[in-house]
Amino acid sequence: MVSVSEIRTAQRAEGPATILAIGTANPANCVEQSTYPDFYFKITNSEHKTELKEKFQRMCDKSMIKRRYMYLTEEILKENPSVCEYMAPSLDARQDMVVVEVPRLGKEAAVKAIKEWGQPKSKITHLIVCTTSGVDMPGADYQLTKLLGLRPYVKRYMMYQQGCFAGGTVLRLAKDLAENNKGARVLVVCSEVTAVTFRGPSDTHLDSLVGQALFGDGAAALIVGSDPVPEIEKPIFEMVWTAQTIAPDSEGGIDGHLREAGLTFHLLKDVPGIVSKNINKALVEAFEPLGISDYNSIFWIAHPGGPAILDQVEQKLALKPEKMKATREVLSEYGNMSSACVLVILDEMRKKSAQDGLKTTGEGLEFGVLFGFGPGLTIETVVLRSVAI
């Protein structure tokens, strides 16, 4: 007879969880940041608010964003005028959009990841889906299972309303699943659509306007598993260690509330200060066991909540400008795509590392860190190990 401990030992993988493939997707509608204030104030019938428009123009100019991708087109917004007002009851209209678009965009990213992985989708054992865009039952995980033609007994995990830190959360969960279930192959999908947060401007709520200047739509998908099959599966990054923490004295730093008017976001001005104040402690906890204290010697993937957060983190840790290059590049080309952002940065980094002829997927370096920041204020930390190219 086999003991329980022997069964448990047999269930565990031998090696660390490894990212085996990455796919990304964005809506076709591309919005140039330089002309967005004109479009935004026109479509929301707010052109008479000239001072507010000038403020918004300055926000967009300082955002370090060149372009974003959005499901919401001029045509869709004209058909749904309640979405263009500030705080008008519009949840039904928003839900009708995202319940369809979140799985559709997620599928696009997942198909690319599965293709790169090179294995039949019947080998996917677990599915993690994450979105801050809408809520439904059965959820986006169920819809994706159907859209992709996955087996009905795939083990599903649906994460709704987590916010911008959740790109780290899905990696942490995927790591635990892959390492504790021998042979598991986890499909991770983050899909974000700003149709829930778009609304017209308000003179009294400038934090809402900040969101209108930063957020974009996008999806990212990964295949995660331990003990890659030689010659068939090609590792991209290994996951070494993960943590989640609530920053002290940060309550109300970032809040989101689902209301009749959609999802409202509230930001304190000092979010960059809270993040930079707590980041050193998170790094020491993560890298002291590895004997690493020079944070310029690792590669960096940070959720680009906005340029001010990146600036303060760089300053606090005396990071060289090139450390945040991949992060800033994604912010510039896509805006803040909430949970999908850090996964898109992972993809950009491994591609650029190969293009530049570097030795590893992590800009030629061995170890790196991935940070997610979001409501709470919650900080997710993931230590990554790159793979030789």
Swiss-Prot record:
Gene Ontology annotations of biological process type: flavonoid biosynthetic process; polyketide biosynthetic process
SUPFAM superfamilies from the UniProt entry: Thiolase-like
CDD domains listed in its UniProt record: CHS_like
Pfam families per the UniProt record, alphabetical: Chal_sti_synt_C, Chal_sti_synt_N
Reactions that this protein is recorded to catalyse: (E)-4-coumaroyl-CoA + 3 malonyl-CoA + 3 H(+) = 2',4,4',6'-tetrahydroxychalcone + 3 CO2 + 4 CoA
Pathway: Secondary metabolite biosynthesis; flavonoid biosynthesis
Enzyme Commission code: 2.3.1.74
Domain of life, source organism: Eukaryota
Active site: 164
EC class name: transferase
Single annotated GO MF: naringenin-chalcone synthase activity
Family membership noted in the UniProt record: Belongs to the thiolase-like superfamily. Chalcone/stilbene synthases family.
Entry function: The primary product of this enzyme is 4,2',4',6'-tetrahydroxychalcone (also termed naringenin-chalcone or chalcone) which can under specific conditions spontaneously isomerize into naringenin.
PANTHER family: CHALCONE SYNTHASE 7, HYDROXYMETHYLGLUTARYL-COA SYNTHASE
UniProt-recorded name of the protein: Chalcone synthase 8
Species per Swiss-Prot/TrEMBL record: Medicago sativa (Alfalfa)
